[in-house]
């Protein structure tokens, strides 16, 4: 199992399996951002490590970007990487606002370079 925090500050290749504008397969909400995973990883839920891709405003199939933070769910074993184009910056408040469509169902903290220790 991979520790999601080790990705903070690093470039990451993401495979997008839920493009922005598509509907969640079980819950019916629309993804306002691209959502995917890091291939060949295993996270706390036994599946690949999930990622939100922020700062890109078109549907993607793959994306290489920088991990600026991790959403660590405190009531679920499924951390999410926050991946952005290199040199983009998002505040914790902006990350919360952009991921609220799905994260509102969970309790979480945002871990970034300044809070990871």
Where are these regions (language model features)?
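Hydrophobic N-terminal alpha-helices or hydrophobic patches in metabolic proteins across all domains
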Residues: 1-117
